[in-house]
Amino acid sequence: MPDANTADPDIATPQLMKEISAAFNSRDVDRIVSFFTDDATFWLARGPEPVGRTLKGKETIRKTLAARFAVIPDMRWDHKEYIFAGNRAISVWTVKGKGADGEELNYQGCDIYTFRGGKICAKDTYWKLVEHKDRL
């Protein structure tokens, strides 16, 4: 157990969350994945599984984010709030951007992070779905 003078690397902190948020907003994939453990799991909000889409491992996360930023090069998160509980943190945000096809992206959501050794070992993304009037 760490003493009062030693920070516990598993505890999520406001500073760490701000650094992770800045990395995502930089869209620098190498910078982003430096915050993940090699064996991290990232569940995307959308995908073919009940959990969305499961990404396993740093390299899979890197490739997926690189592809996402190629399609939405100006993607940007505005973090509204962080909630902390031991080695977990929740980030509440709005994300905006414009796809290569010209479609505007504007979602509200949150990420649930789990940390191990000062790095993200799990990230689970949720967002609100926007239903268009003609689809209701």
PLM regions and their residue ranges:
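Short, mixed-charge, low-aromatic patches
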Residues: L16-S26, P50-G52, A67-A70, V92
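A solvent-exposed, acidic/Ser-Thr-rich amphipathic alpha-helical stretch
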Residues: V29-G86
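Short, low-complexity N-terminal intrinsically disordered segments enriched in polar/charged residues
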Residues: M1-D38, L136
